[in-house]
Amino acid sequence: GGGKDYRVEIVDKHNXLRRSVXXTARN
């Protein structure tokens, strides 16, 4: 993805889990 959810993407890689954030578009 990109933009504001860059932190969430990093967390996904560390936890090996996919997390969805509301209001943010994940590419």
From Swiss-Prot:
Q: Could you cite one Gene Ontology molecular function of this protein?
A: toxin activity
Q: How is it modified after translation?
A: Contains 8 disulfide bonds.
Give compartment(s). Secreted
Predominantly, its location class is secreted
GO cellular component terms, semicolon-separated: extracellular region
Q: Which domain of life is it from?
A: Eukaryota
Q: Which UniProt keywords apply?
A: Calcium channel impairing toxin, Disulfide bond, Ion channel impairing toxin, Neurotoxin, Secreted, Toxin
Q: In which tissues is it expressed?
A: Expressed by the venom gland.
Biological function: Blocks contraction of smooth muscle elicited by high potassium-induced depolarization, but does not block caffeine-stimulated contraction. May target voltage-gated calcium channels on smooth muscle.
The similarity comment for this entry is: Belongs to the CRISP family.
This one is known as: Cysteine-rich venom protein tropirin
* Organism for this UniProt entry: Tropidechis carinatus (Australian rough-scaled snake)
